[in-house]
A protein has these predicted regions:
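Active-site beta->alpha loop and helix N-cap motifs at the rims of alpha/beta catalytic domains
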Residues: 2-147
Length: 149
């Protein structure tokens, strides 16, 4: 069981001006600064972290870069929710292997009409069963979907 009490920093994802590439050194500088404070954890690739703009490889690279600078006691949580269960599971496993200790999974929203309570239950159950780390059900309805959980 993970401890979700305390302060978690919802990290923004910095980009290199003019290129659109993720600026890993800038992100590491931010993480070093935050880790010097009494925080419980950091959230990467959430709503504040521009998750919808990041591909899977970029999310994994963020985790590797974060683990290089964060102390082990700082809980690293990463957004892995994608539009398919298979893709969400694949990314969840990849970020866990890279050092994430928990994941945030928002509901698939593209096919809203197909997202019945049973479909959502099956999606989250499949992700949780396949995940090597705890799964946190996540939703930012004004930004990420119009589904009611």
């Amino acid at each position: 069981m993970i401890d979700l009490s305390g302060v978690f920093i919802p990290a923004v994802t910095p980009y290199v001006p003019g290129t659109g590439e993720v600026d890993l050194p800038a992100m590491q500088a931010n993480l070093r600064r935050w880790a010097a404070s009494p925080i419980q954890g950091v959230v990467l690739a959430g709503t504040t972290g521009e998750a919808v703009l990041l591909d899977e490889a970029e999310r994994v690279a963020l985790v590797h870069a974060a683990r290089e600078v964060l102390p082990s006691h700082v809980l690293l949580t990463v957004g892995t929710g994608l539009e398919s269960t298979r893709a969400t599971i694949r990314l969840t496993r990849a970020v866990a292997e890279a050092g994430a200790q928990a994941v945030l999974v928002q509901p698939p929203a593209y096919y809203k009409g197909a997202m019945t309570p049973e479909a959502l239950r099956d999606h989250y159950r499949a992700v949780a069963d396949a995940s090597p780390v705890p799964v946190i059900v996540y939703q930012a309805p004004l930004r990420m979907s119009t589904l009611d959980l």
